[in-house]
């Protein structure tokens, strides 16, 4: 499956080396090793290929980040490092700030960042509604309804800033967007097509 993953990276225009792929393997192995202790992934995802799919979902957002070219990115609710660790691994041109409220998961994020030698990562251990700083670019893997967190994220978004929410099926996104249109200056939906055939969409919220 790693060969398919490398083909997906190429289709996205994401540069990689044998060293970055080795680091990725190491990262996935650590997620599996500490998965139970730190509650990193669900029971159904505790195998290499399942975690690799999370990695693929994460890296799919990198072309948007490179296109917008922010100085730094705040990743809200990083969990096991999807997408924050993965993005930082394949993009050392900017700083990634990983916001995670769980002590166990924040501890894992700090540990794996050091072991991978990712000096472009900072981990903040707190809830998003306790965050006081404002950011130009925010990512979130948004399994829940966007209405649950759109207002909170807008409060920590700089004027002219952008929130990129990793989402799934298009019809569900359109329903959610209809309830938050008045909150943002502009809303876009971008899709990502890769060779695994999975539907991946991104919700772009401009302040």
From Swiss-Prot:
UniProt-listed InterPro entries: rRNA_ssu_MeTfrase_G, SAM-dependent_MTases_sf
Leader sequence residues: none
Binding site for S-adenosyl-L-methionine: 77, 82, 100-102, 141
GO cellular component, one term: cytosol
Enzyme class: transferase
Location of the protein in the cell: Cytoplasm
Keyword annotations: Cytoplasm, Methyltransferase, rRNA processing, S-adenosyl-L-methionine, Transferase
Gene3D superfamilies listed in its UniProt record: Vaccinia Virus protein VP39
Recorded GO MF terms: rRNA (guanine-N7-)-methyltransferase activity
Domain of life: Bacteria
EC number: 2.1.1.-
NCBIfam families: rsmG_gidB
Similarity remark: Belongs to the methyltransferase superfamily. RNA methyltransferase RsmG family.
General function of this protein: Specifically methylates the N7 position of a guanine in 16S rRNA.
Record protein name field: Ribosomal RNA small subunit methyltransferase G
Organism: Borrelia turicatae (strain 91E135)
């Amino acid at each position: 499956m790693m060969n398919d993953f490398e083909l997906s990276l190429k289709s996205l225009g994401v540069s990689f080396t044998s060293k970055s792929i080795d680091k990725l393997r190491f990262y996935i192995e650590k997620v599996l090793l500490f998965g139970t202790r730190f509650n990193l992934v669900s029971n159904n995802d505790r195998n290499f290929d399942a975690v690799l799919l999370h990695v693929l979902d994460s890296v799919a957002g990198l072309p948007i980040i490179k296109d917008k070219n922010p100085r730094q990115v705040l990743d809200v609710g990083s969990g096991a490092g999807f997408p924050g660790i993965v993005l930082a691994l394949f993009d050392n041109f900017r700083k990634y700030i990983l916001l995670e409220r769980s002590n166990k998961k924040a501890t894992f994020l700090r540990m794996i960042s050091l072991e991978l030698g990712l000096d472009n990562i900072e981990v903040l251990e707190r809830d998003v509604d306790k965050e006081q700083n404002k950011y130009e670019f925010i990512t979130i893997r948004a399994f829940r309804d966007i209405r649950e967190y759109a207002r909170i994220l807008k409060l920590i978004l700089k004027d002219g800033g952008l929130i990129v929410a990793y989402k799934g099926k298009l019809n569900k996104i359109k329903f959610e967007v209809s309830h938050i249109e008045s909150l943002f200056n502009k809303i876009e939906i971008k899709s990502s097509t890769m060779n695994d055939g999975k539907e991946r969409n991104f919700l772009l919220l401009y302040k």
